[in-house]
Amino acid sequence: MYSNTFYGGSSSRPGPTGFGQQQPPPPPPPPPPQQQQQQQQPQQQPFPGFSQPQQQNLQPGAFMPQATGFAGSNPMQQMQMPMQQPQPTGFPPSHQFTGFPLQNQQPPSAVTAVTQQQLSAPLPNPPHETGMTSTQIAHSFAQPATPAVPAQQHASSGSKIPNMRLSFITAQDQAKFEQLFKSAVGNNQALDGETAKDLLMRSKLPGSDLSNIWVLSDTTKSGRLLFPEFALAMYLCNLKLTGKELPSVLPERIANEVSSMVDIISFAVPDARPAPPQTNVPKFDAPLMQNASAPPAPQQPQPQQPSNTQLLSQLTSQPTGFYNQATGLQPPSIVQPQQTGFPAQNAGLRPQQTGFLSNTQPTGYNGPRPPMPPMPTGYGSGLSPSQTGLAPLNAQPTGVPGQWGFVNAPATGLPNIEALQQRLMPQPGREGGFTTQGLSGNATIPWAVTKDEKKIYDQLFRAWDGFNKGFIGGDVAIEIMGQSGLERQDLERIWTLSDPNNRGRLNMDEFAVAMHLIYRKLNGYPVPNRLPPELIPPSTRNFNDSIGTVKSLLSQDAESRKSSGAFLQPQQTGVSYLKNHSFRSGSSTPGAGRKDATVFKNNDDAIGDRREAESLMERIRRVQDDIDTDPKAAFRITDSGAERRSLRRQLQSYQDQLPELASNVRKVERSIADARLELFRLKDAKAHPSAAAAIVGTGPGGTVTESDRIKARARARMQARAAELAGRPPPSTDDDGAAARRLEEETASVKAERERNDAMTRDVEESVKEFTRSLEDSLKDVDENSTREHERRRWEEALGVEDTIRDFIYDLQRASRTARVRKDERTASSQRSVSNNRYDNVSSNGDTLPVRPSQPQSTGSPSLAGLTHQERVTSAKERAQKRIAERMAAAGLKPNSDGSGETLLERQEREKREREERRKRAEEEDAKREQERQRRIAEEQNGPPVKAATTGKKPPPPPSRKGKADGVSPAETRKLGDLKNAAREKAEHEGKERALREEQLAQEAESRRLEAEARQQEEELAREREAAQARLRALEEQVRQGKIKKQEEKRRKQLAEKEAKEKEARLAIQRAELEAAQARERELQRQLEGLDEEESSDDEGPVEVTPQNSTPTQSAVLPSATTTMASPPSVPRPATPPAAPFEPELAFEVASATSTSIPSPESVKQRVAADTESRNPYFRKMGQSVDTQPPSFHTPPEQIPDPLSTTEVAPPPASAPAPPKTEIQSTNPFHRLAQQQESQKSAFAAAPLPGPLTRKSRARPEDDEWSIAESENSSDDDDDRPAGGSAKHLASILFGTMGPPRPLSAMDEKPESKSATPVQESPTVAASPPPPPPPPPPPSEPAPVTTLPPAVAAQDVEEDDDDDDENDFQDAPSMPPPPPPPPVPAPFADAPPTAPPPPPPPAFSAAAPPPPPPPPPVGGAPGGPPPPPPPAGDAPAIPKAAVPDAGAGRGALLASIQAGKGLRKVETKDRSAASVSGRVL
């Protein structure tokens, strides 16, 4: 049916399916007769030729009214058949139908009704619809409106508008236009001119504007509008109505969108062929929609029979009947000849004859003559009445499987075949991006290739095969098949099926097979796994059959020859297999009596012939040797056909890769262009954020449509209005069209650059193709025919010769190969030796080594007198390279030039000259060396120089250099009789060569040895340099380290000197303090003498002192309370020098000062001097301060009561806050001593030391919040404080970098020791210490008191001022007993475990101690009350003999303490005593 025609276009398939579907008689007009003949001839598969008379089924009734309107409306038909003009008026339609018995299936009334419909039906022919072209329609707008003539459209497939957005109108407007367009066109695809005019005239625009709008809208110039054109017209009307000017030319973007949508609609309509003749195709879909007002024209009624057989029988009979009845009214006898054309179809023709009775035909054919003119003109050219029925049957005998290329088109036609042809035709600028849209369908496609398909495919093939090569290469086929839009996998399978021989190219039949498979795939058929018989091309089938026939013939011939023995006969190829003429076998073979003309004309058995043959073979060997030894033998052309064929195959493989490379380049160019556009969009959006944010594209692919711009403008206006109302500045917005303009400019530039690159790529492709063609021409065997090739291969490759000759040829080839290999090896070695010797001659010190003459023949160049094959190839290559360089230069590319502009001939000549010069120089050097050698030999032997000259002639190297190539001259080799001379000369030549080789080998060995020695020397020098550099670096490092060490030593020396000076100053102060302390001690002893003491208390005192005696004496560490207690001047027991456990910097100084026994201050002075002289304590403190920690600070709280027990006898105890000092166990500040020595040293140096007996020093403890009055009341409060004011001050100075020590928290554990009367507790604890020591020495030894540090003396002075002995005594236990000084020079030594070291004072724990307290012997003196336990532990207990009434004094003191007398808290600077106390050295 004709539903797939564009505008009612080509209806090339009015098949039976269409007739079966349309039972009522449709009335569209017929196409011209010639075209209809072409269209209908291939349509009917069973009887293709019978479709011709189809036009005249119902013409008598259908064209009755055409008599009046036919002359004016269809002048063409009027001219064709003027003789039938008067006939239309006389034929009633009823008679016409009665004349066709086969049509009696319908009632006459129905036929008549249909006929009336046909009479009133308008013509769908475009010329009859409007009668105007596109230009006429445009001009009609400017003329007054005329009543429109309704016309009928042809496209009956329904208006199908693609789902595509037009960017120049809004979506709402597009929907409205679609609705209006569909209502106007109905089921058609296009809006005719009159209807479009009516619609456009409603806009009330002037005619000139409407004319311009029509010109701009009708882009196809077809006189009708498709939907995109109609939408464009409405858009232009809207522009004019809004007061804008119409553009003179459509913008490119709008034109592209409209044209692309027009193309989509056109491709969507199958078989779109918008040609005017095709508009006459009848329309079967809506016969009732025709307008009766249209003038009638000759129409082609369709048959009403449901049977195709009846239809065909009518169709075949009527043409002949009309043809014979062309004159008009004919008697029935005229109708009889109709049967003559169809003798085999009498069954179908006989009923039709009744319709042509004499009564009906004269009346029935009076009127219908107007439809007849097309038939004689269309079929009268080459058809006879008999041919119309049977001739097509003979010409088209297919429809049978396997008959390839002669199958008629199917009944449903071949949809989209023309669209496929248009798509696949060569078109510029169609690189890719193809889809199957517009090509796919679901039609019924036969396996075999139809005639129409074959015709179209052949046209495609010829269009692509521009050079008429007869085949299409792989690159072109890829481009053609890729345009179909199919998947790559399907195309690969189709190619495999189409190219069964894997030749990489397709001939015409194979191309048709590929296109047919593509067409089937587009219509939904799968690609088969192998070709069916219907699709095997005739050329391939015939060729395969021919090959099979030849193979069978050869096999049969071989079998027959083998069975009959004829295979031994000489064949036509000239190859002889006869063995009776062989050199090695006799005449025992069956063909002994026959002669083989292809071998020799002579008899091989004859002695003369055999000797002659052997002589010839020997001559051939010698000639081959001459050829091999010739200097130019290396350039002998050894090109063979096999090599050329391999080169051609390689060239073909490279040529096949070219399309893929070009395609990849184009793809990369497209991707680069897209990437550049995308990058520009991003950059533009970043540079103009307002424009980017304002418009958001809603069109296809995110494009910005006109509606988007309108919305953006409205939104911008609203924002500006809102900003104005709010008083804000209006937002800055970019021009709406600026972004689009920038994008268009960038797109244009990118497109231009891409086009330039594409042109460059095409130029490169053309250059490569031209180069390929030149190489192919050079590789072709132009000057060799088959005979010469056969002869050459026969004697060079030993094909078709006897075994003896074949073995001889193989021997010659092996000898040639061996000689060539040897020559190549010698050439390479000689070139190396020449280069090495030349280097040695230049670099050696005068003694040159003999150089073996080079072989010029190894580097000779071929003569170019006659260009050989290789030279032709080289010349072609140079020409192609030159052309490529020129094209690249024209394209702006810089070719990679080697810098040498010389041609091949010039380069060869230059190389030849250089070789000659090198050879001459080498010969001259050889001659000089030989003369020098002969001269030295002559001088050594003292012989005449003539002898040297004679000896010099013996091995002349220069002649050997020339003679190497000419030693065995070709003339001598050609003389067969001079074999001995040739052999002798050859032996001499070989001897010379051996001598030269030996000499060269010796030279090479010597040169290698020299090179090895040179390399070894260089390596040794390099190693020595590296060693020297390493030594230099080591020395530099040593010097640097020595400088650093010297600086450190100098710094240490300066520090030691400074410390020594400071120590001397401190010692002087300490001596003054000791003197003051001694005076204080004497005064206290006098006080103690006056006191009444109980004996028990006197006894207890020494008991407590004894265990402390065992501990190493650290009298300097005893608190000041002990000094108050030691009022009797009794001499204490000799005790070990006290060690101050607290002050890290002053520890060793105090230790040195108090290292001697406490009794004698002189010894203390001597020891201090010895310490200062012997060593610098800071060096030892660095290494040992961390390790040596005084155990006194870690004494458990249980040991605290021990001093309390001794304090019963001692003077009043110190203030209550002292006990917490003794209780600090875990906070030993000496743990961090090593890290804080420097800071403590500076702090101690800055801290002021109290004077020995000044009141100022005694008043300082009270200033430090240790008042005497509140000793008892503030004992608990003192636990919370780290120490007295001076302790805090020192701690802040000495331990500023450290956190507050833990003793603050640990002091809470000793509240009982702070009690005002610790004497009662002390006896209980005193039981634990060891028994009392022996009686103290006489009181005449108060020396130990003098050993107390000045700080202790100051504290004693303070105690005297306060007169509160009990408080003083209580303070004694608070004093930390300094640990015994270790023998090591460390500032603190561990005390022996036997003596419980008294707890350290809180000042120790809290901060650095003040200056060292007075020595502990005062507290331990027996004359007075017993000193507190810490001093007893630090110093030896003073014997009771020291004080005459020591026991009584102690008892009185104890009684007063028991009576409740409060002990004054004496601010004994035990901390300073501990800090000053040093280790015993």
Swiss-Prot record:
Subcellular compartments: Cell membrane; Endosome membrane; Cytoplasm, Cytoskeleton, Actin patch
Keywords carried by this UniProt record: Actin-binding, Cell membrane, Coiled coil, Cytoplasm, Cytoskeleton, Endocytosis, Endosome, Membrane, Repeat
Cited PROSITE patterns: EF_HAND_2, EH, WH2
Chief location of this protein within or outside the cell: membrane
Annotated Basic and acidic residues bias: 751-766, 869-886, 904-939, 972-1065, 1077-1086, 1164-1174
Signal peptide annotation: none
Ranges of residues in domain EH: 173-261, 453-542
GO cellular component, one term: actin cortical patch
Bias (Acidic residues) ranges: 1090-1102, 1262-1280, 1356-1369
Domain of life: Eukaryota
Family: Belongs to the PAN1 family.
UniProt protein name: Actin cytoskeleton-regulatory complex protein PAN1
Record organism: Ajellomyces capsulatus (strain NAm1 / WU24)
Gene transcribed to yield this protein: PAN1
